[in-house]
Regions:
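Catalytic-core segments of class I nucleotidyltransferases/pyrophosphorylases
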Residues: 29-102, 106-124
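Conserved beta-loop-beta/alpha segment of the NTase-like Rossmann-fold superfamily
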Residues: 1-25, 52-56, 61-67
Protein backbone atom coordinates (compact mmCIF):
# COMPACT_ATOMS: atom_id res chain seq x y z
CA UNK A 1 0.00 0.00 0.00
CA UNK A 2 2.68 2.49 -0.97
CA UNK A 3 1.72 6.01 -1.97
CA UNK A 4 4.71 5.93 -4.30
CA UNK A 5 7.66 3.79 -5.31
CA UNK A 6 10.90 5.02 -6.84
CA UNK A 7 13.36 2.86 -8.74
CA UNK A 8 16.95 3.31 -7.58
CA UNK A 9 20.33 1.88 -8.49
CA UNK A 10 23.70 1.51 -6.79
CA UNK A 11 26.47 2.88 -9.00
CA UNK A 12 30.23 3.25 -8.77
CA UNK A 13 30.13 6.93 -9.72
CA UNK A 14 26.96 8.75 -8.63
CA UNK A 15 28.12 12.11 -9.98
CA UNK A 16 25.24 14.05 -11.48
CA UNK A 17 22.48 11.95 -9.94
CA UNK A 18 20.07 12.58 -7.09
CA UNK A 19 20.88 10.44 -4.06
CA UNK A 20 18.52 8.05 -2.28
CA UNK A 21 18.68 8.66 1.47
CA UNK A 22 17.52 5.81 3.69
CA UNK A 23 17.06 5.53 7.45
CA UNK A 24 18.79 2.96 9.67
CA UNK A 25 16.10 0.39 8.76
CA UNK A 26 16.56 0.86 5.02
CA UNK A 27 13.38 2.88 4.52
CA UNK A 28 13.38 5.73 2.02
CA UNK A 29 13.70 9.07 3.82
CA UNK A 30 14.57 11.51 1.03
CA UNK A 31 15.72 12.02 -2.53
CA UNK A 32 18.35 14.77 -2.67
CA UNK A 33 19.51 16.36 -5.92
CA UNK A 34 23.30 16.49 -6.21
CA UNK A 35 23.40 20.29 -6.34
CA UNK A 36 21.43 20.44 -3.07
CA UNK A 37 23.38 17.69 -1.27
CA UNK A 38 25.75 18.15 1.64
CA UNK A 39 29.08 16.29 1.89
CA UNK A 40 27.59 13.28 3.72
CA UNK A 41 24.80 12.88 1.17
CA UNK A 42 27.26 13.11 -1.72
CA UNK A 43 28.99 9.96 -0.38
CA UNK A 44 25.84 7.89 -1.03
CA UNK A 45 26.12 5.70 -4.14
CA UNK A 46 22.42 4.81 -4.42
CA UNK A 47 20.81 7.08 -6.99
CA UNK A 48 17.36 8.00 -8.24
CA UNK A 49 16.59 6.53 -11.67
CA UNK A 50 13.82 9.03 -12.33
CA UNK A 51 11.31 6.18 -12.51
CA UNK A 52 8.34 6.67 -10.19
CA UNK A 53 5.03 4.95 -9.59
CA UNK A 54 2.47 7.04 -7.73
CA UNK A 55 -1.00 6.56 -6.38
CA UNK A 56 -2.50 9.17 -8.71
CA UNK A 57 -4.88 10.73 -6.18
CA UNK A 58 -2.16 11.02 -3.55
CA UNK A 59 0.23 12.58 -6.06
CA UNK A 60 -2.40 15.14 -7.03
CA UNK A 61 -2.95 15.93 -3.35
CA UNK A 62 0.66 17.16 -2.94
CA UNK A 63 1.54 18.69 -6.32
CA UNK A 64 0.36 22.18 -5.40
CA UNK A 65 2.69 22.12 -2.36
CA UNK A 66 5.88 21.56 -4.37
CA UNK A 67 8.06 24.68 -4.25
CA UNK A 68 11.02 25.86 -6.29
CA UNK A 69 13.07 26.92 -3.25
CA UNK A 70 16.21 25.00 -4.19
CA UNK A 71 19.55 25.90 -5.75
CA UNK A 72 18.22 25.43 -9.30
CA UNK A 73 14.91 27.23 -8.64
CA UNK A 74 13.19 24.22 -10.23
CA UNK A 75 10.14 22.19 -9.28
CA UNK A 76 11.45 18.72 -8.41
CA UNK A 77 9.08 15.75 -8.78
CA UNK A 78 11.01 13.95 -6.01
CA UNK A 79 9.69 16.64 -3.66
CA UNK A 80 6.33 14.87 -3.99
CA UNK A 81 8.01 11.91 -2.26
CA UNK A 82 9.14 14.21 0.57
CA UNK A 83 5.63 15.64 0.97
CA UNK A 84 4.01 12.19 0.98
CA UNK A 85 6.45 11.10 3.70
CA UNK A 86 5.69 14.26 5.69
CA UNK A 87 2.00 13.38 5.39
CA UNK A 88 2.73 10.00 6.99
CA UNK A 89 2.35 8.01 3.78
CA UNK A 90 4.40 4.93 3.02
CA UNK A 91 6.86 5.38 0.17
CA UNK A 92 9.17 2.68 -1.13
CA UNK A 93 12.39 2.51 -3.08
CA UNK A 94 13.15 -0.55 -5.21
CA UNK A 95 16.82 -1.03 -6.05
CA UNK A 96 17.38 -2.39 -9.56
CA UNK A 97 19.76 -5.36 -9.67
CA UNK A 98 21.50 -4.04 -12.78
CA UNK A 99 22.26 -0.34 -12.56
CA UNK A 100 22.87 -0.13 -16.33
CA UNK A 101 19.13 -0.49 -16.92
CA UNK A 102 18.22 2.69 -15.04
CA UNK A 103 21.04 5.10 -15.76
CA UNK A 104 20.25 8.39 -17.47
CA UNK A 105 22.31 11.03 -19.20
CA UNK A 106 22.58 14.47 -17.61
CA UNK A 107 25.47 15.59 -19.81
CA UNK A 108 27.41 14.50 -22.94
CA UNK A 109 29.90 12.45 -20.91
CA UNK A 110 27.12 10.40 -19.31
CA UNK A 111 25.46 9.94 -22.72
CA UNK A 112 28.74 8.58 -24.09
CA UNK A 113 28.97 6.22 -21.10
CA UNK A 114 25.48 4.90 -21.88
CA UNK A 115 26.41 4.47 -25.54
CA UNK A 116 29.50 2.47 -24.52
CA UNK A 117 27.37 0.21 -22.30
CA UNK A 118 24.88 -0.31 -25.15
CA UNK A 119 27.66 -1.12 -27.63
CA UNK A 120 29.25 -3.57 -25.18
CA UNK A 121 25.90 -5.36 -24.86
CA UNK A 122 25.46 -5.45 -28.62
CA UNK A 123 22.66 -2.89 -28.78
CA UNK A 124 22.61 -0.69 -31.85
CA UNK A 125 20.18 1.04 -34.16
Amino acid sequence: DCAATVISAKVDDPTGYARIVRDENGNLRAIVEQKDADEETLKINEVNSGGFWFDCQLLLSVLDRIKSDNSAKEYYLPDAIKLLLEDGRKVGAFTAQCSDTVLGANDPAQLEQLNEIARAKGYSC
